[in-house]
Amino acid sequence: GKYQKMGTLLLALFPDGGIPAIREERDAARLNLLIDCLGKLQRYAYAFERGGHKDSAHDLIVYAAMLEEMTL
């Protein structure tokens, strides 16, 4: 299933192949939002040949805006 590939996708995002240390609540919240964005991208990719997944595209906009708000 899709959830089984999420770990590989997540680790591929980070240059050293490992998730950075979570030192503050803000770090945890940003990582959570990054995972949310990745999940929406994954769902869209799985539906790509059928024209995409509109709800996931919309949710991605929302999660990305939230991530921007938390970015220093």
Predicted segments with their positions:
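Intrinsically disordered, low-complexity regulatory regions
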Residues: 1-72
